[in-house]
Amino acid sequence: MTYFMFLLLMALVVGLVAVASNPTPYFAALGLVVAAGVGCGVLVGHGGSFLSLVLFLIYLGGMLVVFAYSAALAAEPYPEAWGSRSVLGYVLVYLLGVGLVAGFFWGGWYEGSWVVVDGLKEFSVLRGDVSGVAVMYSSGGGMLVICAWVLLLTLLVVLELTRGLSRGALRAV
């Protein structure tokens, strides 16, 4: 399990480097989806299955809006890929920076961070992430509905802004 978590964390770093180093929105959005998926996989590995599912759905909703906006405004006939020299230079600089920071903090930080949420499961009836679900839907239900409406409104505004003068599928908006 430790090796699997190490592999997920390395994939998270690679996904975030892919997002940070790419100037083209198509490939950066793909890196963002990979980074979000791997980050939620790390949460599942630590025992937060419901939290990771909710975060992944929120990430995908937000990334849909961002990707629609960036892809419509920055449509390039020949997008710059990860293999080009400038992007490869950024990738190497970011990986070197991550390696230097990891080398600076390497002394034992990983030993205490692998504790899962079920470490004290004999004292609890429910899992750690499930006990917060009732509070989220009872006390935070209104905020959840407001956030869903804001995401929908943002999607419609982005689609309206990127439509321009062409008469697309959203003629009534």
UniProtKB/Swiss-Prot annotation:
- Which molecular-function annotation in GO is an example for this chain? NADH dehydrogenase (ubiquinone) activity
Write out the catalysed reaction. Answer: a ubiquinone + NADH + 5 H(+)(in) = a ubiquinol + NAD(+) + 4 H(+)(out)
| TM stretches of this protein | 1-21, 25-45, 53-73, 87-107, 141-161
Its membrane topology: Multi-pass membrane protein
What is this enzyme's EC? 7.1.1.2
What broad class describes the main subcellular location of this protein? mitochondrion
What keyword terms does UniProt attach to this protein? Electron transport, Membrane, Mitochondrion, NAD, Respiratory chain, Translocase, Transmembrane, Transmembrane helix, Transport, Ubiquinone
Q: Does the keyword Mitochondrion apply?
A: yes
Q: Which Pfam families match?
A: Oxidored_q3
Please provide, in alphabetical order, the Gene Ontology terms of the cellular component aspect for this entry: mitochondrial membrane
Give the first-level EC class, as a single word.
translocase
Compartments annotated for it: namely: Mitochondrion membrane
Concerning its family, UniProt says:
Belongs to the complex I subunit 6 family.
Q: What does this protein do?
A: Core subunit of the mitochondrial membrane respiratory chain NADH dehydrogenase (Complex I) that is believed to belong to the minimal assembly required for catalysis. Complex I functions in the transfer of electrons from NADH to the respiratory chain. The immediate electron acceptor for the enzyme is believed to be ubiquinone.
PANTHER family with a match to the protein in the record: NADH UBIQUINONE OXIDOREDUCTASE SUBUNIT ND6, NADH-UBIQUINONE OXIDOREDUCTASE CHAIN 6
Protein name stated in the entry: NADH-ubiquinone oxidoreductase chain 6
Gene name, Swiss-Prot/TrEMBL: MT-ND6
